[in-house]
UniProtKB/Swiss-Prot annotation:
The gene is deoB. It catalyses: 2-deoxy-alpha-D-ribose 1-phosphate = 2-deoxy-D-ribose 5-phosphate; alpha-D-ribose 1-phosphate = D-ribose 5-phosphate. This is Phosphopentomutase. Binds 2 manganese ions. Its EC number is 5.4.2.7. Mn(2+) 1 binds at D13, D339, H340. It comes from Streptococcus pneumoniae (strain Hungary19A-6). Pfam families: Metalloenzyme (PF01676). SUPFAM superfamilies: Alkaline phosphatase-like (SSF53649), DeoB insert domain-like (SSF143856). Mn(2+) 2 binds at D298, H303, H351. Pathway: Carbohydrate degradation; 2-deoxy-D-ribose 1-phosphate degradation; D-glyceraldehyde 3-phosphate and acetaldehyde from 2-deoxy-alpha-D-ribose 1-phosphate: step 1/2.
C-alpha cells in the first residue's frame, strides 16, 4: 500500500541553491560556474522574502553561507535538503530526465553562437527559402518576431533561432509560410539534428499572426522532441496503471513518454499554478503523480540576468504556495525542487551548474528536519518506492525519512 496516495512534484525552473562540486567544469561567457548561487545571490543582492517556503525549511538547507534573508526554522513544517546532479549537462532536458532517474552521459548540444552554416544551408536547400542570419542566436520568442517579423512578411525568409536549451525554433507568419509547410520544414530539421555535432532535444514550430508591432504567437505550436533513451519512472508508473499528470512543458520534455494526462502548456507561472490546482481538484485523480514545471524564473529573469524580476517571481510563487497546500489531501506529498541554476547576478546568460533545493511537505507528516544531501534522481526513486514500482537507472529513495 502506498504511503502517499498522490505525489505532486513542482519544478521551479532554474532555482538553484549554490554551485555544485563540479561547477568549475561548466562556464558562462568564459567564467567557470564555481561561484554561482542563484538563491544565495538573489537573497544577498536584492533580498528575498519567501515565508511559506521558509516555513517548510528552505532556510534549513545545508549551505556554507546561510541564505541572507531566509532564516532557518526551529520547527519547520516539512523536510528539506539539496540535491547534486550526476549527468553531464545543465540544460532543462538533462535536469528533468535525471530527476526521473536517468544518467545522461552524452549531453545535448547547445548553440550559444547560433547554428552552424551547414545546418542553415541544408534547411535553405530543403525549403527553398532563405534563413535570416541575424536571428540565428539565442533569442526571446516574442522579441525575435518583433525584430524580424516585418522582414519575413516582405521576403518570406525563415526565422530560425535557439535558446539556452538544446532547441532549434522556427518562427513563421501563418499568412506567409502556411502551417503545413512550416511543419514539413521542422520535420526535416528534426531529421538532421539527431546526432552530434548537432544533437538537439527539440525542434519547435512557432507560428504567429498579426501585423508589425502587434504580432501574436498562435496555439499551432508543434514540438518535435526526442524521447528519453531509456525508461524513466514515469514509464514505470504508467506501466503499473498509475496516473501521471503533466503541467507546463513537462509533456514536451519527455516527448509524452510515460504521461497519460497532459494538462497543457503554461501561459505564465500563475497560469501553471492554476492548472496544477485544477489537476489536484480532479475527482478522478485519487492516486498518482503530478509533475509541474514553472518556467518564468528561468525564461523571463535568469537568462536576462534580472535579479529583481527573479526575486519578485519567487515572491509570487511563495504567495500562492498556501493555495497549493490547501488543495492537498491528507495523504498527499508535495515536493518542490528545481532542474538547474540560472544565477541572475552571474556572468553570461546561460544556466549555472548548481545544487537544487528540495522541500517536502505533507499534511500527514508527524516529523520534520533535514534530509541528507543526495542526487536529482533520488526524487524519482522516492516516487517509485512510494508507488511500488522499479526505479530507473539511478537514484536512492528517501521515502523512509519522511515521517
Amino acid at each position: 500500500m502506498s504511503k502517499f496516495n498522490r505525489i505532486h512534484l513542482v519544478v521551479l525552473d532554474s532555482v538553484g541553491i549554490g554551485a555544485a562540486p563540479d561547477a568549475n567544469n561548466f562556464v558562462n561567457a568564459g567564467v567557470p560556474d564555481g561561484a554561482s548561487d542563484t538563491l544565495g545571490h538573489i537573497s544577498k543582492t536584492v533580498g528575498l522574502n519567501v515565508p511559506n517556503m521558509a516555513k517548510i525549511g528552505l532556510g534549513n538547507i545545508p549551505r556554507e553561507t546561510p541564505l541572507k534573508t531566509v532564516a532557518a526554522e526551529s520547527n519547520p513544517t516539512g523536510y528539506a535538503t539539496k540535491l547534486e546532479e550526476v549527468s553531464l549537462g545543465k540544460d532543462t532536458m538533462t535536469g528533468h530526465w535525471e530527476i526521473m532517474g536517468l544518467n545522461i552521459t552524452e549531453p545535448f548540444d547547445t548553440f550559444w553562437n547560433g547554428f552552424p552554416e551547414e545546418i542553415l544551408t541544408k534547411i535553405e536547400e530543403f525549403s527553398g527559402r532563405k534563413v535570416i542570419r541575424e536571428a540565428n542566436k539565442p533569442y526571446s520568442g516574442t522579441a525575435v518576431i518583433d525584430d524580424f517579423g516585418p522582414r519575413q512578411m516582405e521576403t518570406g525568409e525563415l526565422i530560425i533561432y535557439t535558446s539556452a536549451d538544446p532547441v532549434l525554433q522556427i518562427a513563421a507568419h501563418e499568412d506567409i509560410i502556411p502551417l503545413d509547410e512550416l511543419y514539413r520544414i521542422c520535420e526535416y530539421a528534426r531529421s538532421i539534428t539527431l546526432e552530434r555535432p548537432a544533437l538537439l532535444g527539440r525542434i519547435i514550430a512557432r507560428p504567429y499572426v498579426g501585423e508589425p508591432g502587434n504580432f501574436t504567437r498562435t496555439a499551432n505550436r508543434r514540438d518535435l522532441a526526442v524521447s528519453p533513451f531509456a525508461p524513466t519512472v514515469l514509464d514505470k508508473l504508467n506501466e503499473a496503471g498509475i496516473d501521471t499528470y503533466a503541467v507546463g512543458k513537462i509533456n514536451d520534455i519527455f516527448n509524452g513518454a510515460g504521461i497519460n494526462h497532459d494538462m497543457g502548456h503554461n501561459k505564465s507561472n500563475s497560469h501553471g499554478i492554476d492548472t496544477l490546482l485544477k489537476t489536484m481538484g480532479l475527482a478522478e485523480f485519487e492516486k498518482g503523480f503530478s509533475f509541474t514545471n514553472l518556467v518564468d524564473f528561468d525564461a523571463l529573469y535568469g537568462h536576462r540576468r534580472n535579479a529583481h524580476g527573479y526575486r519578485d517571481c519567487l515572491h509570487e510563487f511563495d504567495e500562492r504556495l498556501p493555495e497549493i497546500i490547501a488543495a492537498m489531501r491528507e495523504n498527499d506529498l508535495l515536493l518542490i525542487t528545481a532542474d538547474h541554476g540560472n544565477d541572475p547576478t552571474y556572468a553570461g546568460t546561460d544556466h549555472t551548474r548548481e545544487y537544487i533545493p528540495l522541500l517536502a511537505y505533507s499534511p500527514a507528516f508527524k516529523g520534520n528536519g533535514v534530509i541528507p544531501v543526495g542526487h536529482f534522481a533520488d526524487i524519482s526513486a522516492t516516487v517509485a518506492d512510494n508507488f511500488g514500482v522499479e526505479t530507473a537507472m539511478i537514484g536512492e529513495s528517501f521515502l523512509d525519512k519522511l515521517v
